[in-house]
Amino acid sequence: MKMEEMSLSGLDNSKLEAIAQEIYADLVEDSCLGFCFEVHRAVKCGYFFLDDTDPDSMKDFEIVDQPGLDIFGQVFNQWKSKECVCPNCSRSIAASRFAPHLEKCLGMGRNSSRIANRRIANSNNMNKSESDQEDNDDINDNDWSYGSEKKAKKRKSDKNPNSPRRSKSLKHKNGELSNSDPFKYNNSTGISYETLGPEELRSLLTTQCGVISEHTKKMCTRSLRCPQHTDEQRRTVRIYFLGPSAVLPEVESSLDNDSFDMTDSQALISRLQWDGSSDLSPSDSGSSKTSENQGWGLGTNSSESRKTKKKKSHLSLVGTASGLGSNKKKKPKPPAPPTPSIYDDIN
């Protein structure tokens, strides 16, 4: 026999009923207190009567479904503009003008100062980033002076190999035309040495600067007088590509002394000079011709034609002689002896 059965069997019915009543009272009290606490909390927080319906308030907010009236029971006018209240300035604005007004009122419009300041800051940041990426060796290139907008357009046009502008000779800032070599390079963007053959590389290094940029890895296509690079840099590049026997070419190559001499050209010019013709002006020559015609009374058509032919041949010979002389580098003149001054006598 178990312990529980022994304990319950020892009690009479009156005691058992009293115990059951006590337990039941505790359960009812707990449930009532819980319900009372919930009602009290709902009343204090203000949501106790939310589920209840008020007939008067329901009539005020009843949806109207009648012809000629809107859902609020007002007469519908399709020409009346709807109005909205601006959350920033609390002004009533027509619905059609609410969006533009809100942009200007909040400072988000196109012409607002905030957008302008933001654009200025963005442009400054872009200019700084472009200047940091730009190579110091290519500071004075043509594309740098034309501006960033034209630079992008120029690079796009240079990418097209069939563009007729690539075959045209470019003009430098100082007015010199680009090199008339069979290998033509773009002076503004440089050229990659990896795409060149040995003959093209040798031709470029004999006529142009050729120093490789550290940032763009392209060769400088300026002349041998390039102010951005030194002779030591040019010599190092030529030794690297052409071997240790490579020599830096001279800027101006002079002709041999046996080929042509300035004294010979001066003698040729003096021998071909026409007596007194170079000193006469066109008006004097015309008057002299008319005086000769009147004095001698001879037919001067043949003599004038002979003189003009002789003069033309003389000018052509003089031009060729001067052209030959200009191709040769002039010999440096010896320094003039110092002129005596009055201070020498005093000393």
Swiss-Prot record:
This is Ataxin-7-like protein 3. The keyword Metal-binding applies. The long N-terminal helix forms part of the 'assembly lobe' of the SAGA deubiquitination module. A zinc finger (SGF11-type) spans 84-105. Residues 116-125, 275-288 have a biased composition (Low complexity). Component of some SAGA transcription coactivator-HAT complexes, at least composed of ATXN7, ATXN7L3, ENY2, GCN5L2, SUPT3H, TAF10, TRRAP and USP22. Within the SAGA complex, ENY2, ATXN7, ATXN7L3, and USP22 form an additional subcomplex of SAGA called the DUB module (deubiquitination module). Interacts directly with ENY2 and USP22. Residues 196-263 form the SCA7 domain. GO terms for cellular component: DUBm complex; nucleus; SAGA complex; transcription factor TFTC complex. Belongs to the SGF11 family. Keywords: Activator, Chromatin regulator, Metal-binding, Nucleus, Phosphoprotein, Transcription, Transcription regulation, Zinc, Zinc-finger. Residues 116-184, 275-347 are annotated as: Disordered. The modification Phosphoserine is found at residues 129, 131, 278, 281, 326. One of its GO terms (biological process) is chromatin organization. It comes from the Eukaryota. Residues 132-141 have a biased composition (Acidic residues). Component of the transcription regulatory histone acetylation (HAT) complex SAGA, a multiprotein complex that activates transcription by remodeling chromatin and mediating histone acetylation and deubiquitination. Within the SAGA complex, participates in a subcomplex that specifically deubiquitinates both histones H2A and H2B. The SAGA complex is recruited to specific gene promoters by activators such as MYC, where it is required for transcription. Required for nuclear receptor-mediated transactivation. Within the complex, it is required to recruit USP22 and ENY2 into the SAGA complex. The lineage of its organism: Eukaryota, Metazoa, Chordata, Craniata, Vertebrata. It is found in: Nucleus. PANTHER family: ATAXIN-7-LIKE PROTEIN 3. GO terms for molecular function: transcription coactivator activity; zinc ion binding.
